[in-house]
């Protein structure tokens, strides 16, 4: 089962926390749609900023949005001008006061979502898929990952028949629930069709069964860089 299921969903409540943290009664569906809309908007608006995660909290009719990004300078802008414009746009979309936090990802090479998007962008630029995969694996292992696996599927290199290629280094224990396995997905839209990229990064084991363990570990790697 661990081979098939999304590794993040399987570990929620064990060593991962939810990306949407709020409680609602009859407005649940409306707020859920709003979350999806906000995430889609932020990913499109901040496509060049390397956004990995968007955490949404809703305390007392407000919204607190935390953006995990590899390039906080792109989000914040000159003298904080861009972040203020972004905050106003999000307030208009939610109809409530929005607090924005920007968290810098110090090691983007170890973030599965950013690695997947990077490989997808390289495939769109016609970089050889084996070279892109190998480079990503070497960078992750050099920066301290205990294991990484990358799957690329589709008409790789413009081949007539679609296929799936994978590359792995180290160990990626998908069945071990205490294992801190990060997972990311990207799609490359090439002239031959779409190619899917999946990335699993194993960063070590979290022994304490603490729902905040993921955030505690992330706090050591990342540093806040915004308001």
Swiss-Prot record:
GO BP terms, alphabetized: translation
Keywords: Ribonucleoprotein, Ribosomal protein, RNA-binding, rRNA-binding
A matching Pfam family: Ribosomal_S3_C
Taxonomic superkingdom: Bacteria
Gene3D superfamilies: 3.30.300.20, Ribosomal protein S3, C-terminal domain (3.30.1140.32)
UniProt keyword Nucleotide-binding, yes or no: no
One Gene Ontology MF term: rRNA binding
Entry annotated with the keyword Transit peptide: no
KH type-2 domain sequence ranges: 38-106
Similarity remark: Belongs to the universal ribosomal protein uS3 family.
Function as written in the Swiss-Prot or TrEMBL entry: Binds the lower part of the 30S subunit head. Binds mRNA in the 70S ribosome, positioning it for translation.
Assembly, per entry: Part of the 30S ribosomal subunit. Forms a tight complex with proteins S10 and S14.
Protein name, entry field: Small ribosomal subunit protein uS3
Species per Swiss-Prot/TrEMBL record: Paramagnetospirillum magneticum (strain ATCC 700264 / AMB-1) (Magnetospirillum magneticum)
